[in-house]
């Protein structure tokens, strides 16, 4: 090819800025990255990401610097935009088996609505129940029931008192106990010296009278116990009738706010019924103890018990998809058992480790439900025990959050260890994008063919 001499001005390239289509390079932020020379990889990625079939996860082969991660993230976001927003995930207290919290899926945004609604119900009840129990109508009816029982008790005690007087005994009540003393001919209490001075025949009569009186006291107590229970049950029923409209009003308003069709609607209804029952069974916890000082131990115990009750009614929103417009795309750069599968936090109460449904935390797999998650094979393999657990997840498609996942929690054994929580497992639909080198891909094929076959979409970046 012949050589040609060029003039200096021919060595200078001049481009008109108006022809570029942008004012500054800042406008190029967010522009799609080109798949230069990677058309086959692009087609494979789009095929795998858009195919909604089980066991069609993606394995991305390519060397560092090939653009594999950036291009796959871009493709994942494009595919996610075509998918619906997945539901929220909540964990609820299990009233029958507290160690097994219930999982509840709700349409996106309604998990936050349920959590806030239950918080409002709790706050309103704490303010309204004491007011309702202090109302004139309630006090009048409670007083009537108390007077009815008091009349029965007074009549029965009057008979017992007459029985005691007929046997020359004086019957009194001291600190909830029945106390009787011998009386003389004029009804005055006998001193110990006077009692010892009585003739043997009289002392024998007194012994018989004392036995008869003790037996009569026993019959009196046997008669009063069921009457006391009936009074307490009547008062408890009155309290429930008085407070039930408040509880129903709060929970019905919450139900009406959740207008969308809920797949787990039956589960939610059952839980709300159990919440209502628990609140009505413990109405007394909402009312301060009138015979106790505000800082007394008994009042502190009541407040602690109320806090525990309301905690059981809390909603733990572990995955909140409110405000999303597409399926999630999660990039997990530090996969551990804790970050990938979730964990359970613990609290310390009176030197005892405690855990309940409010301590459940979601991992990346739960957050990616309905969408995509990107992992690097090298990172997963470097974490001890993580690959076998991921393999089990791929096999069954269900995720179980476990105690002590990834460390950081309390010891699983010992006197201060809590009863192990077993949150309800949940089905997770997620497309996994696993990035690795060519060597790692074929090593996986040889070492774990059963898992490798679940990555049927092979995205091969050419060098």
Regions found by a protein language model. Give the residues of each.
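Non-catalytic accessory segments flanking P-loop/AAA+ NTPase cores
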Residues: 1-463
């Amino acid at each position: 090819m012949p050589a040609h001499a060029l003039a200096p001005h021919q060595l200078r390239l001049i481009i008109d800025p108006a022809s570029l289509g942008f004012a500054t390079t800042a406008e190029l932020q967010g522009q799609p990255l080109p798949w230069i020379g990677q058309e086959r990889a692009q087609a494979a990625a789009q095929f795998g990401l858009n195919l909604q079939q089980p066991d069609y996860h993606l394995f991305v082969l390519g060397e560092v610097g090939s653009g594999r991660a950036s291009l796959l993230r871009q493709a994942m976001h494009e595919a996610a935009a075509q998918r619906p927003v997945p539901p929220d995930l909540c964990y609820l207290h299990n009233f029958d088996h507290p160690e097994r919290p219930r999982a509840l899926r709700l349409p996106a945004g309604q998990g936050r609505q349920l959590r806030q609604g239950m918080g409002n119900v709790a706050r309103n009840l704490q303010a309204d129940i004491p007011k309702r129990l202090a109302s004139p109508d309630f006090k009048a009816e409670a007083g009537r029931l108390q007077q009815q029982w008091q009349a029965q008790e007074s009549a029965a005690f009057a008979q017992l008192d007459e029985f005691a007087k007929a046997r020359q005994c004086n019957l009194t009540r001291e600190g909830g106990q029945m106390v009787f003393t011998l009386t003389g001919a004029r009804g005055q209490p006998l001193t110990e010296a006077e009692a010892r001075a009585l003739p043997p025949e009289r002392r024998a009569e007194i012994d018989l009278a004392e036995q008869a009186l003790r037996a009569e006291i026993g019959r009196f107590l046997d008669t009063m116990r069921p009457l006391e229970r009936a009074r307490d049950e009547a008062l408890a029923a009155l309290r429930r009738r008085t407070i039930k409209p408040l509880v129903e009003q709060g929970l019905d308003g919450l139900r009406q706010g959740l207008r969308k069709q809920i797949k787990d609607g039956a589960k939610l209804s059952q839980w709300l019924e159990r919440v209502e029952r628990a609140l009505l069974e413990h109405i007394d916890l909402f009312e301060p103890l009138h015979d106790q000082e505000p800082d007394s131990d008994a009042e502190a115990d009541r407040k602690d018990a109320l806090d525990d009750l309301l905690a059981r009614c809390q909603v733990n929103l572990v995955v909140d998809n409110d405000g999303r417009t597409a399926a999630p795309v999660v990039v997990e750069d530090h996969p551990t058992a804790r970050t990938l599968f979730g964990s359970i936090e613990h609290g310390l109460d009176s030197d005892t480790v405690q855990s309940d449904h409010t301590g459940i935390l979601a991992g990346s797999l739960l957050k990616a439900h309905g969408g995509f998650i990107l992992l690097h094979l090298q990172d997963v393999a470097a974490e001890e025990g993580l690959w076998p657990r991921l393999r089990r997840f791929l096999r069954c498609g269900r995720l179980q959050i476990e105690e002590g996942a990834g460390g950081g929690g309390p010891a699983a054994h010992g006197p201060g260890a809590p009863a192990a929580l077993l949150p309800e497992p949940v089905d997770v639909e997620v497309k996994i994008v696993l990035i690795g080198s060519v060597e790692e891909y074929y090593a996986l094929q040889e070492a774990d063919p059963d898992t490798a076959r679940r990555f049927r979409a092979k995205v091969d970046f050419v060098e």
